[in-house]
Design a protein with these regions (language model features):
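Intrinsically disordered, low-complexity segments
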Residues: 1-4, 10, 260-263, 267
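Charged, amphipathic alpha-helical regulatory modules used
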Residues: 3, 8-122
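Conserved catalytic cores of very large enzyme subunits
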Residues: 108, 114-550
Length: 550
């Protein structure tokens, strides 16, 4: 008796009835056996190798595969293993093509299964790592869902088709973690530190127009957020301002000079003078170059006004300058409020993400820079909305520098005060020590600022000079992604204008655990010190190897 598989197949007498054979598919479903499916798959491998019109050999291989069936049920994977075995016996090149095709099908199948599971979670807005991974993205909004869909699909594409296999496997196994896989195909940079002074002075272009130099603290703060928002679509990481106090100080001075001009012009007009406000503005800009002019500068300014025919006495001028100062402080506070509110509400990338923003400050000792820091800290404590919610952005970093914002003597003096409020009222040698105290108070209430210690040996720059008005160029600044970019193999050591490409994390806890296990197997005695030393050596060698691999 024979089993009729196809017109080409004649199986032996001991062959089971093929009509009784049941195929178990990968999803557990069952279906009747079909020899034609094996024939078709082998035929495609032959064609892919460039071998055509090989029907006889294909049918012979199919028959050999079927002869291996020993049970009435068999899995798809088992059949494919048999096909590979038989192909390797007669046509190794065809076998390679079959194996590659099989792997590709497995990859596609796995991708569809995993991606569907991920997509289902996004649709249902599950509280998982995917939907909660970005603090600056709302995954429950339609735009957020669309961005998450795109992100997960692109990660999968990058992992399967762009990354070299060894790195993809290391990432999947958890030996390393390659960040920002979703932006890997776009070839964009990750984070950057802006030189706002350069952008403000030269102006910059957005999609629909150019921006000129701002002329008030409100404009400075607003344009800073616009710069953040504009560049958000040019890269995929966070953005930072390395010297926020220095960059905003010019805006404070301009607002003060405008306030003096406005109040003084109004006062002179009330006294019956015919005032050309532009001329007054020029005089103010030339002589009042700080918001707290010294008695000598005030006297010179008063003399100039009298020479120009304006009868203003000393008390009247002091009143005008005090009014201008208070107006400037109020404007600066509103500018800092607006800055914080904008960075927590303005959506840019994909219409859904707020900017992942950071600002560094703390070392500008000018009256204007100090006012910026002071009002920023006040606005941070006040928080967002009517309930004073803690603002997530911008991430704030206060730069601590000995002799500028800290000294041991000042610290000891402050510790003698009853509380921090009393300590902040005192005077100190370090000009910004009172702001450091206020920053500590703000951190206790609003989580930010963080603190960066510039006197740590690896954070120092030999070019830093207290008398340099642009000393911020030589101060370390960090980005919200906790990235420290300072050293430079190809240029000047600075954080200004620097950024990074996306990074890879090494799984050091795993390396440490593995090193400990290996050490315990190598050292047979119970000498804990010897085991510890061997584990350290193995760990350091593993770190070196992994570093070379990355």
């Amino acid at each position: 008796m024979t089993c009729n598989v196809s017109p080409f197949f004649n199986l032996s007498m001991n062959c089971m009835n093929l009509n009784e054979i049941c195929i178990i598919k990968r999803d557990g479903k069952r279906e009747n056996f079909s020899a034609a499916k094996i024939t078709n798959a082998i035929g495609k491998a032959f064609v892919a190798t460039g071998l055509e019109h090989q029907e006889a050999m294909i049918n012979e291989i199919t028959q050999r595969v079927i002869e291996h069936f020993a049970e009435p049920t068999i899995t798809v994977e088992a059949i494919q293993d048999l096909v590979e075995t038989e192909l390797m016996k007669v046509q190794p090149e065809v076998a390679k093509k079959y194996i590659i095709y099989r792997q590709w099908r497995n990859t596609e199948r796995d991708r569809k299964t995993q991606i569907k599971h991920i997509m289902d979670g996004i649709v249902a807005i599950d509280k998982n790592d995917i939907n909660l991974s970005n603090a600056n993205m709302s995954s429950h909004t339609p735009a957020g869902q669309m961005m998450t869909f795109a992100s997960e699909i692109t990660k999968d594409y990058t992992y399967k088709y762009l990354l070299p296999k060894k790195y993809a496997e290391a990432h999947q196994l958890g030996d390393i973690h390659i960040h920002d896989l979703d932006y890997y195909p776009t070839k964009t940079t990750t984070c950057i530190q802006y030189d706002l002074d350069d952008l403000f002075e030269r102006g910059f272009h957005t999609k629909n127009g150019s921006i000129r130099t701002p002329q008030s603290i409100q404009s400075y703060a607003t344009l800073a957020t616009i710069i953040f928002q504009t560049n958000q679509n040019e890269q995929h990481g966070g953005q930072a301002i390395p010297a926020f106090d220095f960059f905003m100080a010019k805006g404070v001075l301009k607002s003060y000079q405008k306030a003096v001009t406005s109040i003084l012009s109004f006062f002179l007009e009330m006294k019956g003078y015919n005032v050309a406000e532009n001329d007054v503005q020029k005089t103010v800009n030339q002589q009042l170059t700080t918001i707290i002019p010294s008695a000598e500068i005030q006297k010179e300014f008063l003399t100039t006004l009298n020479k120009e025919g304006f009868n203003v006495n000393e008390d009247e001028l002091k009143h005008i300058l005090n009014k201008a100062y208070e107006r400037t402080r109020k404007d600066t506070h509103q500018a800092m409020e607006g800055f914080i509110h904008n960075l927590n509400t303005m959506h840019s990338r994909g219409g859904n993400q707020v900017v992942f923003s950071s600002i560094n400050y703390g070392t500008d000792t000018s009256a204007e820079g100090r006012m910026v820091i002071d009002e920023l800290l006040k606005a941070t404590i006040e928080g967002l909305g009517t309930r004073g919610e803690v603002p997530v952005f911008p991430i704030q970093i206060f730069k601590v520098k000995d002799g500028v914002s800290y000294s041991e003597k000042d610290f000891e003096k402050a510790m003698k005060a009853e509380n921090i409020e009393e300590a902040m009222k005192d005077s100190y040698e370090a000009p910004n020590f009172d702001l450091l105290l206020k920053a500590c108070q703000t951190t206790a209430k609003a989580l930010f600022p963080n603190f960066m210690f510039l006197d740590t040996p690896f954070n120092q720059n030999e070019k830093w000079d207290i008398n340099d008005p642009k000393r911020y160029k030589y101060e370390l600044a960090t980005m919200g992604c906790r990235t420290r970019v300072f050293e430079n193999l190809n240029g000047e050591k600075t954080s200004l204008g620097r950024g990074n490409l996306s990074f890879t994390t090494m799984n050091m806890p795993r390396l440490a655990i593995e090193a400990r296990i290996k050490a315990e197997n190598i050292i047979e005695s119970n000498n804990s010190d010897a085991i510890e030393q061997e584990a350290c050596n193995l760990f350091l060698e593993s770190v070196r190897e992994m570093s070379r691999f990355i």
